[in-house]
């Protein structure tokens, strides 16, 4: 999957339908994924259908990132580093997330 080609699609979707509509679509896709998880747990759908719903959420999350890429990436790195620290994979303490957000503002 080429990120440049995907970014072109994400930009076109946001330009065509607007950020507010795409946030709404993200909420809708997350709801469908939640329902699919419950159906999968009760063996009402196959794994491929569950993965399909996850992909829909992933596409929408990529659009959410596209709208706020710098802040999104900063917070993502913070969260991954926090997990890394909890797992004992690093001794570096996590920086304060509020400082990350203040640097953005």
Which positions does each model-derived feature cover?
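Flexible "arm" and connector segments at domain edges
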Residues: 1-105
